[in-house]
Amino acid sequence: MSPIENSSSWTLESDLEDLDLDLQDYKPSVPLKKVPNGDIFEASRAGDVDRLRYLVETGVNVNARDRWDSVALYYACLAGHIDSARLLLENGAICSEHTFDGDRCHYASLNLRIRKLLKAFEARPPPLAPLQASLRDTFLGCCHNRDYLQQEEANLDVSDTLSEFGSSNYFPPDVMFYVQGRPIEAHRVILSARSPFFKQKFENEWKDRREVRFSKEKLSYPALCSLIHFFYSDRLEISVDDMEDLVRICKVCKCESLQKIIEKELIHQRYAEYKTHRDLDNSMKRFILQGISLPEEDRLPASLHRILRVSLAKSFVGDVIDSSVGDTRVGDSVESLADVCVRVDKRNFYCHQVILASRSEYFRARLSRVNDFHEGKNGLPGDTLPFLEEHDLSAEAFEKMIEYMYTDGLKEINPNQAEEIFDVASRYLLFPLKRAVADALLPHLETATPAELCQWLVLSDMYGVLKIREYCLDLVACNFEAFVETHEFRAMLLTLPPPSGDSSLRTTVPSAPGAMMTTDQGNLLDDLREKWLEAEALELDMRDESALIFDKRLAMLVEIAEREKSESEAEDYKDTSA
């Protein structure tokens, strides 16, 4: 689920109760207005949340600067638009008071409510996307990594967010670094995807090494651990005192975009020494950077997509081959650092265990069995990759599944594949994959015929794909008279449970006009009735009566559909008898 959809889960009002606020503190300095063609800066300044949400969903960088070197959050804070500020913060806008952009936002805040919002998000960063969250869980599942970061959280005097991580998140590392005698557990493919330095090392000098010991005393353990944590989570959290060490490590690891951002923040830190809060607060300060601040090609999904492309290119070489598992040699996978071979429909896919295990509980269990009992080796030589074989799905569907597992999205999809992928998402416990399929399918649905929309409505209801279900229900409700004229819509009614006639039995009770719609999946025809009442914008005192009229209309359509079905069966019987 995207951070935008999770916005309701952020409840900061309790944090504001202890503030003595005037009514004027809750009002923006300028009235809200719509800027349908505005950029992110204009939308933030105007308080146009709908336009801002659209821009964020299309991938606009929320930390981009305009020609006055200002970010969008600055304008939202300056104008007092708390909803716009909250939306930007939930999607990675920098708000730390110890950064250049965050400092400006704090000082420009129109009122205490805005400043309190910034403080709340500074103490508790927004939730990570599914890919980043899964890999972060894997990183913190390693006990040495978790112990160090828990110690850092205690030193930084922030709430404990790591206590829930334990053995259930553990997936064994394939490389261990020792810095000043202290270990960091990691996985080669993640480091290689994020850093050209690590990629070159793992392909050459460190190819067969499971432990790497750094002898340089100047190498900072906190800085290196924070950087590797960033490689997994796309979120950098580091003590301000360790930032200079991190710049040196970024230079060696060739993380140029991250290095430039940290260098700029260091300049700000040097010129911010006059700030009185440094004297008042003796606790260590931390710097937080979201991955969205980096160019898209340097973020985690793009980095893993490059690894995936190399792996898929090699899988095409083995297309529809009948050779034995013994042909999948380690040497074939050096470039992509693949460490498992998955065969689907006679095609070999070179994959990475840590990605599969982090994204799917099913693969975590399968790979754990392979590693513990050598299920995939079957007595083959030691230079062969572990081998898995998956059944009852096509190679095309598996390719789309691993594309999502590596990148958290799907660039495009054939509508004919959708049902199989929905089924695959359920079987492999990859439920967010359904949302990614829905996002890729929506452009196709814009040109779908009523008959096709009826099919999509039934399919989305069957697999619980709420986004497509809601989209189809909205279209049917707004064009109800056009749909009732189609044979496919009437035939669909025969396959669905009837609507709840008694209002006490309805899964979706008619709500007041303009009220927030429920997203819980209930009886499909009950929900269609609610959508229709909403589209008709009927007055509250007429809604129950109108709901009964709607139910009677559906009952008439069902009778027509049954008659049409009987006539069709009779004609088919005559044809077979002739």
Curated annotation (Swiss-Prot):
The keyword Repeat applies. ANK repeats lie at residues 35-64, 68-97. Pathway: Protein modification; protein ubiquitination. May act as a substrate-specific adapter of an E3 ubiquitin-protein ligase complex (CUL3-RBX1-BTB) which mediates the ubiquitination and subsequent proteasomal degradation of target proteins. SMART domains: BTB. It comes from Arabidopsis thaliana (Mouse-ear cress). The BTB/POZ domain mediates the interaction with some component of ubiquitin ligase complexes. Residues 173-240, 338-414 form the BTB domain. It holds the Pfam family Ank_4. Keywords: ANK repeat, Repeat, Ubl conjugation pathway. GO terms for biological process: defense response to bacterium; innate immune response; protein ubiquitination; regulation of defense response. This is BTB/POZ domain-containing protein At2g04740. It comes from the Eukaryota.
